[in-house]
Amino acid sequence: MKKFLIVALSFICLICAGCFEVKFGLTITDSGAVIQHSKFIGTAALAPQIEAWKNQAEENNPNLQVKAVVEGDLRGYKFDVSYPDVETFSKYAGGFYAAHPEKNSGISRYASWFFDTYDFDLYFAGAPELTAFETTVNQALLSQAVFDVEINLPYAADSTNADEVSADGKYLKWHLAHVTINGGEKFMQARFKLWHKDKLAATAAVELLLLFATIFFAIKAHTEDFEAAKDFRFKRNVFAGLFVALTALAAFMIH
């Protein structure tokens, strides 16, 4: 996938007429699976280059899913690659998803019982410093270009520097066309959680059992004779203490 990304990014540097649209994106499911999306569409003048990129992408990744796309006068392809989890994706992803020395840390994971926290620290460098003439030419040729990076999350991001964020905080978008045209650097950052639903359910089940036990022994303590009631009160207090302790611990770990 890294070779594919490098080839794809060369698309931005072509000196050609016409407009085009390039989008890179990720969809991360609540189970942690990752679907990597790429879209390359352009005018008829770019058809040979787009077809060549498609062929090379398929050679580099046999699991690549390719779909033809037509949007008005623009034609091209969408590419999808699936990964079982974020860790696997981070191993194979290249380009701005990878770490670059002294620039960014790439993708980092911080594991805990109820959730894993992920830091996406991505980096993209535009063309080297350009002369005024080269900048003017690039702006003229690429004025209608769209080059975005998008991330779809199952839960709202904890923090991000995205240029666009949806109202629910789950959709993030960064615009790279300006950096591509004028040169410079773009740092893309997002922090988000992936919750362990099985562990949440297991913890909730244990808390319910402790609560039911507390209620059961509390009732028994009120209905039995004095001697038996002392034993039931002791058990009630033990289970109540465990329930409160586990609830407090869970609340602390979640926050």
In which residue ranges do the predicted regions lie?
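One face of beta-strands
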Residues: 20-40, 120
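Positively charged n-region of N-terminal signal peptides that target proteins for export
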Residues: 1-4
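Structured domain cores in non-transmembrane regions
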Residues: 41-117
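Juxtamembrane boundary at the C-terminal end of a transmembrane helix
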Residues: 249-255
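Juxtamembrane interface at the cytosolic side of transmembrane helices
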Residues: 212-239
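C-terminal motif of bacterial Sec signal peptides marking the signal peptidase cleavage site
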Residues: 15-18
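Intrinsically disordered, low-complexity linkers and stems that provide flexible hinges
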Residues: 110-210, 214
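Solvent-exposed coil/turn segments that connect beta secondary-structure elements
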Residues: 31, 41-43, 84, 152-156, ...
